[in-house]
Design a protein with these regions (language model features):
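Metal-cofactor-dependent catalytic cores
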Residues: 1-116
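Non-catalytic beta/alpha edge segments that cap or flank active sites
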Residues: 109-110, 114-208
């Protein structure tokens, strides 16, 4: 935003706060607030900012924003509202974005919320599991832990599992594909012993 103190190359270029959050805070504080009193750049209505996740996108006409942060550290006595009321809503319910595509916006413009899913891939290395000699148990176990990790959090994982033989080229191809396709997380399991076909650490380190 031209002339804004937070303009520049970093992750908090634009701040947003929902009118619904301001109204709840105003009712609890027993006073009214004007747009911008919380130093938000954009005041929204009708969109649940608290339900958004980091990496989600907000489209406002030609402008494209990527959500980078929920809330912030309270400035305490350096904040006029905190000094007056004893608390502030922005540190808890405000969100911050970086600008992916610039442009001009105006009051009354619609905001489109685009969900982002974290591409999480689990790769099991096992000749016998790949051949169907026995069932892969470690991949599903890793998936269970990932699902528990994200449970109750804003992130939205999209988890896929793959069983490969203990083959360096097959693993390398899967890792390169994950990198090129923008995967957020790749977890390998298996192939870490001392046998001649336990190649996982060497392949991963070569691509690190």
């Amino acid at each position: 935003i031209k002339g804004d103190a937070h303009a520049g190359v970093w992750h908090r270029q634009v701040s947003l706060l929902a009118l619904e959050s301001i109204e709840r805070f105003a009712a609890a504080a027993g006073r009214t607030f004007a747009y911008g009193d919380f130093a938000e750049n954009i005041t929204t209505r009708g969109i649940d900012l608290l339900a958004t996740a980091v990496f989600d996108r907000l489209s406002i006409g030609e402008v494209e924003l990527e959500i980078t942060q929920h809330g912030k550290k309270c400035h305490g006595d350096d904040c006029a509202i905190f000094r007056e009321v004893g608390r502030c809503v922005m540190p808890h319910e405000g969100i911050f974005c970086r600008v992916l595509q610039g442009g001009t916006i105006k009051a009354g413009d619609s905001i489109v919320h685009q969900l982002h899913y974290l591409d999480c891939r689990i790769i099991t290395l096992s000749d016998r599991a790949h051949q169907g000699v026995y069932e892969d148990l470690s991949g599903p176990r890793v998936r269970k832990h990932l699902e528990e990790l994200f449970s109750g959090k804003r992130g939205r994982p999209r988890i896929t599992m793959q069983v490969l033989p203990d083959d360096a080229e097959a693993l390398r191809a899967a890792l390169v594909a994950a990198r090129d396709e923008g995967a957020a997380l790749v977890i390998t399991t298996g192939g870490t012993g001392i046998g001649p076909r336990d190649i996982t650490p060497d392949v991963v380190l070569a691509l690190a």
